[in-house]
């Protein structure tokens, strides 16, 4: 079965020449070895990064064995570095980006695609060429690139990709276009992905681009183009089952001299206006499906394109992208070609650049600036929603699919996924959280990823006024596709922390809500399903007791209260609710306190015997999708279902040694050993099985070999004892004093974090800074005492990746 993987690595031109004559009797050496960061790294942007030295000869040998994509079972395995310094194994095959005739003229340029063996939803595009190796890895947690250091042979940086801000002008298609004369094919309908569509891309380069970003040569510029198109195909193949392939005479579109090329590089408009004639003359109007031109812009990025001109006899090459870095231009190019393929802008904001007339009323599905490929991510302050995601919104996909009427279709042996979603028609109360849960299956066993997105169109609206706008503008931003087909609106973390989630706005007016669930198999297959809700003039539905943190005894009774506010009446018609209990702060609710009770605002429950400091109550509407969670943790006292006679923890060199004993045990599955740097937030370290049922004494021990990781002078330990029925109870907490020197290391915890972090290894007088991935300072605090510094995170901080910096050291921080 043929599969189309994501990969892009540029490799040194000389690498493949070293394949012949390699001595196979030599002991294998590591492909990557840790390297000293380049001197310029200290002044570089603060994206998490790591540095490695590449064994170029070994890489050439291993890539030479890569099979074509039609033989995926023979894929070669290659280790690739991540920004955190770890190595991950990828399965790679050769994937064409150039037409065969073009590839024959530039044999030093090779392209590959693949997926991570430990996470099939993480893909890579890799290429080798005159400038070295380049790779871009895309997964549920983001995108990072492996880049050659031009100052040192075989030294590479693995760096988290930074967002790129650019100016864009989308122009409506002025006429009804006619399809090209050859390779026509009908537009697809979802689900799709059993065929891959290949379209011929005529990509031109100005003399300025060639000199500044292509090394001044045709070969270097073609290699740069291949890198860009490989990155585009990672997205287009995944979301659109579409592959772009550089036309055979692409080298004729590469210009070396700005003084003699046919382009005016002064603006994207001038470039676009000239490109149609240039491409038609060099390639021929019937020999390409889509055209674009690359220019150079010092210190910025910009683009322009007509919308929906792909496959046309005129304006098919009406698009231009300019920038100052070839590595970052893929973001611009993906967006601009997205216009040519058929998608207008998807933002609905009316502030900043969003107020400039580029909004499309028919595709404005994203609140504020939006954050998918066709949005104005980061350019519409104060309506930026943050956390750009490199995929097409469901609305963009529909618009593009309706325009794909040309290209060559090839069966790829893939089977699209199938989807099941809740029925439409639920009425929910205003200002009340809700969840939508789907399920997906894949005949090929592919690891599916899912995204729930809103499909509502209303008046242009800022984030501040959207909740009460009866014209039904979009309220909920997009998030990167995840392994779960369930989404909670707004994010569960904001509900539990009683904070606002930027770009997730609960409606406060009666209106419709429309959503689409998209399932991707990450092999060009996709399925979609829609769900419609109605927001009624009822609610908000919320828990009023407990209204804050409380303490109670396990197995005790408690009266839960909530606001009904018309949710028991039409059109919501919620007659009964279910009351659930969580012991992990609201992350899961496995305990049913009442399976069904009238929705009358009060019910008496019996708490479980489980001891916890992180209890929460959830009231879930029966036969509906809305719910409410109480606003504070519930502490329940309890005792272990074993007779614990001893529990100790002590430091031994760099480790902590834990020992405990029981006199007897009843229904004891075992002990989860948990640790905490602050005595409040614990995480699991390991598992020790229990005796089940025993009347005899038992001895247990556990070793925590990494005391330094906590970055704190004191580490806390506890046992989470679990019954055979799943009931959990906790032991007393024990503390360990970390030996001097270990606690002085620079550390940040918890990580991921929500409301606050502790920073260790910071001396009095030193400044701790919080930065986003663009280097923008968000918060700073001076250490005034010894011990960890407590850094409160701003409530307005969006979910995503940040950097904590102090005294020249940096740590990556994930905010949930």
Protein language model features and the residues they cover:
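Fold-level signature of zinc-dependent metallopeptidase catalytic domains
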Residues: 27-38, 44, 155-305
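The catalytic-center signature of Zn2+-dependent metalloproteases
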Residues: 247-270, 310-388, 453-463
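Surface-exposed, proline-anchored Ser/Thr-rich loop/turn motifs
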Residues: 550, 641-665, 731-762, 771-778, ...
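Extracellular acidic, Ser/Thr/Pro-rich low-complexity tracts
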Residues: 439-444, 521, 563-570, 664-666
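Short, compositionally biased serine/threonine- and acidic-rich segments at solvent-exposed termini, linkers
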Residues: 637-743
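Recognizes extended acidic, P/S/T-rich segments that occur
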Residues: 465-500, 593-595, 672-712
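N-terminal prosegments of processed precursors
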Residues: 25-147, 270-273
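Glycine-centered tight-turn motifs at strand-turn-strand junctions
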Residues: 602-605, 681, 686-710, 756, ...
């Amino acid at each position: 079965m043929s599969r189309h993987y994501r990969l892009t690595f540029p490799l040194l031109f000389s690498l493949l020449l070293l394949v012949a004559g390699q001595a196979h009797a030599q002991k294998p050496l590591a492909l990557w070895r840790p390297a000293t960061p380049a001197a310029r790294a200290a002044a570089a942007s603060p994206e998490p990064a790591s540095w490695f030295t590449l064994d170029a000869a070994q890489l050439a040998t291993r890539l030479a064995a890569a099979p074509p994509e039609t033989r995926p079972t023979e894929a070669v395995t290659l280790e690739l570095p991540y920004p955190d310094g770890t190595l991950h194994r990828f399965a790679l095959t050769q994937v064409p980006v150039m037409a065969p005739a073009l590839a024959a003229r530039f044999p030093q340029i090779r392209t590959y695609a693949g997926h991570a063996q430990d996470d099939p939803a993480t893909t890579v595009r890799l290429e080798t060429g005159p400038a070295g190796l380049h790779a871009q890895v895309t997964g549920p947690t983001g995108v990072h690139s492996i880049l050659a250091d031009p100052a040192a042979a075989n030294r590479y940086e693995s760096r988290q990709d930074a967002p790129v801000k650019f100016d864009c002008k989308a122009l409506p298609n002025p006429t009804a276009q006619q399809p090209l004369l050859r390779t026509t094919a009908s537009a697809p309908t979802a689900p799709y992905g059993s065929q891959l569509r290949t379209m011929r891309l005529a990509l031109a380069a100005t003399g300025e681009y060639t000199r500044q970003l292509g090394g001044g040569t045709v070969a270097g510029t073609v290699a740069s183009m291949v890198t860009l198109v490989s990155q585009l195909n990672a997205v287009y193949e995944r979301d659109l089952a579409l592959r772009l392939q550089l036309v055979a005479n692409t080298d004729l579109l590469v210009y070396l001299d700005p003084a003699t090329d046919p382009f005016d590089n002064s603006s994207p408009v001038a470039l676009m206006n000239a490109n149609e004639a240039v491409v038609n003359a060099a390639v021929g109007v019937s020999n390409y499906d889509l055209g674009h031109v690359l220019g150079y812009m010092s210190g910025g990025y910009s683009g322009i394109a007509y919308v929906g001109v792909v496959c046309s006899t005129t304006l098919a090459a009406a698009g231009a992208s300019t920038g100052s870095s070839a590595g970052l231009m893929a973001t611009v190019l993906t967006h601009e070609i997205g216009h040519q393929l058929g998608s207008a802008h998807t933002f609905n904001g009316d502030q900043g650049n969003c107020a400039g007339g580029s909004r499309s009323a028919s595709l404005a599905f994203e609140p504020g600036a939006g954050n998918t490929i066709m949005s104005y991510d980061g350019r519409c302050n104060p309506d930026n929603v943050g956390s750009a995601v490199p995929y097409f919104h469901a609305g963009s996909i529909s618009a593009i699919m309706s325009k794909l009427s040309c290209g060559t279709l090839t069966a790829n042996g893939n089977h699209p996924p199938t989807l099941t979603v809740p029925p439409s028609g639920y009425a929910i109360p205003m200002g009340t959280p809700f969840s939508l849960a789907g399920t997906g299956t894949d005949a090929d066993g592919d690891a599916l990823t899912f995204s729930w997105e809103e499909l509502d169109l209303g008046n242009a609206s800022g984030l501040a006024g959207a909740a009460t706008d009866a014209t039904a503008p979009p309220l909920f931003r997009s998030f990167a596709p995840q392994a779960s087909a369930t989404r909670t609106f707004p994010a569960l973390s904001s509900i539990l922390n009683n904070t606002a989630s930027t770009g997730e706005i609960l409606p406060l007016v009666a209106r419709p809500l429309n959503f689409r669930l998209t399932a991707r198999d990450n092999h060009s297959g996709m399925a979609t399903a829609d769900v419609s809700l109605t927001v009624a003039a009822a609610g908000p539905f919320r828990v009023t007791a407990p209204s804050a943190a409380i303490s109670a005894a396990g197995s005790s009774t408690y009266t839960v209260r909530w606001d009904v506010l018309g949710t028991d009446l039409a059109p919501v018609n919620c007659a009964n609710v279910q009351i659930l209990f969580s012991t992990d702060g609201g992350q899961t609710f496995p305990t049913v306190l009442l399976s069904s009770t009238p929705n009358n605002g009060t019910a008496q429950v019996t708490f479980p015997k489980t001891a916890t400091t992180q209890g929460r109550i959830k009231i879930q509407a029966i036969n509906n999708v809305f719910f409410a969670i109480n606003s504070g943790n519930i502490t329940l006292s309890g005792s272990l279902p074993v007779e614990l006679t001893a529990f100790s923890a002590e430091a031994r060199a760099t480790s902590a040694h834990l020992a405990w004993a029981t006199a007897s045990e009843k229904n004891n599955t075992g002990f989860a050993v948990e640790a905490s740097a602050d005595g409040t937030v614990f995480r699991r370290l390991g598992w020790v099985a229990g005796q089940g049922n025993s009347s005899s004494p038992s001895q247990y021990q556990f070793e925590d070999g990494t005391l330094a990781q906590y970055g704190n002078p004191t580490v806390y330990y506890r046992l989470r004892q679990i019954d055979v029925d799943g009931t959990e109870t906790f032991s007393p907490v024990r503390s360990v004093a970390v030996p001097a020197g270990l606690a002085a290391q620079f550390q940040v915890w918890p990580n991921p974090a929500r409301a606050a972090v502790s920073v260790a290894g910071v001396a009095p007088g030193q400044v701790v800074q919080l930065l986003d991935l663009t280097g923008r300072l968000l918060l700073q605090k001076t250490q005034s005492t010894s011990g960890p510094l407590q850094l409160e995170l701003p409530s307005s901080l969006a979910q995503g990746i940040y950097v904590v910096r102090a005294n020249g050291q940096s740590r990556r921080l994930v905010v949930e």
